Structures are given as structure tokens and as C-alpha cells.
Amino acid sequence: MNAIIIIPARLGSTRLPEKMLADIEGEPLIVRTWRQAMQCCRASRVVVATDSVKIAEVLTTYGAEVVMTSPEARCGSERIAEAARQFACDVVVNLQGDEPLISHETIDLALEPFFSPNPPDCSTLVFPLQPDDWAQLHDPNQVKVVLNREGYALYFSRSPIPFQRNQLTSTQCYRHVGLYAFKAEVLQCFAALPPTMLEEAESLEQLRLLEHGYRIRCMVTHDDQPGVNTAEDLELVRTLFKQRHQEA
């Protein structure tokens, strides 16, 4: 099985402009994420897909492989689908460029189901939440997911799901970790599909897959590392990197 990692990276960001080039202990954010991906054991190649010449020029100075993509892509998965057409592979990992602390073990975990006799259409990661974790459950920036008994996603939402009607019982809640691995052919089919009603209502591209009948296997991870979406996130990640360097 040949798996590749593609990291979509765009320069524009509403909440944190040019965050991909933000400095983290001497290296740009996107370079930090690329370095983590390069340590992955189950992928044979790591590529960054971008529509920004500025990002491409920075990455090439570090030796990263870069593919230029169209600025018309509607989401990260469409951008990696465009890039993936240039490579012969069985599985494509969509790793967000703003995840500089993600471990290679976590990426490998997302690829694990594709080594089974019955691989899924797509896999992703989820982190277990406590039912009383009110802040994360009610934060629309934290996407929640409910699973069936086999570990496949039933639904993703920015609202707290499942609703805890009976406070005397507790149901396991999960937060979605935005990393995906696709069968190569499923990725291309997904990118060709028009956006769906639920996808647009929640602003969650993975709902396009569920609405069209694809199955998403959710692997539970306990490695909870922050991504970079806001200026506050960036400062937290900088602090964590500094602590790691001091401990090394």
C-alpha cells in the first residue's frame, strides 16, 4: 500500500493573516508541520500543495517538495485532490498545514485502517471529551462527532452532540481532529461532488462524504496537540516549542 501525505497551505487566512509563514522558534509554521510529517513511517512521500508562490519559495529553501495548485479550490480536500492527480498512490493523507505539534505516531494512526483486510473509504481522528467539558462541547470552533459501534462517524457538528438529556447518565463525546486519509479514488470522487446542504449549513466539508454515503472510520487518539487558528493559538504553540527545546 502506497500512501502519501499532502499538506494544503494557503497564504490567506481570515483570523490570522499569513499564518503559514508565522515564525515558531526560528522556522515558519508550515515548515514545522512539514517536518513532523516527514517522520511518518507509513507514508512514502510528503508534498505541500499551495497556490502561493511566497509559500512555495520558502518551502523549497528547506528542501520540501511543493506542488502549485489553483486558487479556485473551495476547501483543503479539493486542493489536495488536484495535487494528488500528479502521483501514483493508493491512499492520500490530508494534513492541515497549521498542525506543527502533531506527532508522526498520530499520522500513522490515521493510516492504520488501510492496512486491514477491509479498508475504509476515509479515516480521521477523534479525541475523547468528558461530558462535563462544557467549554469544548459548546465551542463552535471545536467540531464534535458521534460514532457507531464499529467506530464509523454518524455525524459531525459544531453543536454539542450527542445532547445529554438525562444528566444522570453520560455518553462518550468526541472532538474531531482535522486530519484525513482517503482512498485515492474516493478523494477524487469527493472533490468532484458539489457541496451539500449539511456541509454548507455546518461549514464542514466531511459532511459531503457522509451525505453521499461514504464511510469515515474514526480512530481515537489521546494525543491532544493544539493547532494554530488564532493569534492566541500561535502564542501557545510558540511557548510549547520553547519548552520542548529547553527540555531537550
Curated annotation (Swiss-Prot):
The family classification in the record reads:
Belongs to the KdsB family.
| Protein known as | 3-deoxy-manno-octulosonate cytidylyltransferase
Q: What Pfam families is this protein classified in?
A: CTP_transf_3
Q: What molecular function does GO assign, one term?
A: 3-deoxy-manno-octulosonate cytidylyltransferase activity
Provide the leader sequence positions.
Answer: none
BP GO annotations: CMP-keto-3-deoxy-D-manno-octulosonic acid biosynthetic process; lipopolysaccharide biosynthetic process
Listed under catalytic activity are: 3-deoxy-alpha-D-manno-oct-2-ulosonate + CTP = CMP-3-deoxy-beta-D-manno-octulosonate + diphosphate
* Gene encoding the protein: kdsB
Origin, by domain of life? Bacteria
The record's top EC class is: transferase
A GO cellular component annotation here is:
cytosol
